[in-house]
Amino acid sequence: MSNKQAVLKLISKRWISTVQRADFKLNSEALHSNATVFSMIQPTGCFHLGNYLGATRVWTDLCELKQPGQELIFGVADLHAITVPKPDGEMFRKFRHEAVASILAVGVDPEKASVIYQSAIPQHSELHWLLSTLASMGLLNRMTQWKSKSNIKQSTNGDYLVNDSDVGKVRLGLFSYPVLQAADILLYKSTHVPVGDDQSQHLELTRHLAEKFNKMYKKNFFPKPVTMLAQTKKVLSLSTPEKKMSKSDPNHDSVIFLNDEPKAIQKKIRKALTDSISDRFYYDPVERPGVSNLINIVSGIQRKSIEDVVEDVSRFNNYRDFKDYVSEVIIEELKGPRTEFEKYINEPTYLHSVVESGMRKAREKAAKNLADIHKIMGF
């Protein structure tokens, strides 16, 4: 077995014991007494349903459970966002603003959690450089996100078909994205990181870099952060349920936003791609991806198992009734966040004060931890 194969096998083995799937509703046993929770989301404007169910509702649950001695840091990953170029500065600034409004709208309490802009805390970038001296090209090449964002072709079984020409076109920032993500997490000595399924591979790399640093400098400095996966499976596009819901989808009817009006939500769900296999509604992501996506959405919102939702919708025998039920569930869930978003988006001074307060606390911790890292490394 080569050294590279041994490292990859070790990472995979340890990953199993450092991932926890969040319950439908977190309880006080989810975190230990001095836990530090860290998570960020890219600024793409007002959050959509996938952002909400796949990430930020867990943040809200954690705020409700926070105990003295625990720390929550949630942020806007604006440095990560520019790994895909954002040439319109004014629009990007607007998206950053809307991201903060969305974080508060879903229920994150700024009295319990620090809300930050990644770019405003320079220690993120410096630790990125320090960790990049430990990260091998082989491990980074194994990451899938740079391949998906570079539109690398995939085989029928989902493997990426990478050639030298493809690699030569990849921007360095996108390729090293996972190292910056590791720096974001380790800078605060985070113990728990809520992420979606598509980010779990990056948390493997984060733990690997933490262990490598600790072993190299013979210090137990960085904890191995636990991956907290949301209970809801990935929310998919309403029109193309083979890919995840995304604001960049050219078909706006594919995405449900927090600030969508009830009539818009109902229209989008009625137009959602389903099938003609049966007028009985059951969960089968391969044969019935559209129907399964709608069942998954209801499961996430209601915090019920897929099996329970399938039983609930068994009373419907036509698509209109089924889809109207899904619409009602979504409309009711987003009623509060929609109202709160409209309130916060019109309070820029308050949003600025929330971020400034959060960054003051985060900068203090970031500065202390980076100073300790400098001392360990001999700077």
From Swiss-Prot:
One of its GO terms (cellular component) is mitochondrion. It is found in: Mitochondrion matrix. The keyword Nucleotide-binding applies. It is an enzyme of class 6 (ligase). It comes from the Eukaryota. GO terms for molecular function: ATP binding; tryptophan-tRNA ligase activity. Its main location: mitochondrion. L-tryptophan binds at D184. Its EC number is 6.1.1.2. InterPro entries: aa-tRNA-synth_I_CS (IPR001412), aa-tRNA-synth_Ic (IPR002305), Rossmann-like_a/b/a_fold (IPR014729), Trp-tRNA-ligase (IPR002306), Trp-tRNA_synthetase (IPR050203). Belongs to the class-I aminoacyl-tRNA synthetase family. Homodimer. This is Tryptophan--tRNA ligase, mitochondrial. The lineage of its organism: Eukaryota, Fungi, Dikarya, Ascomycota, Saccharomycotina. The gene is MSW1.
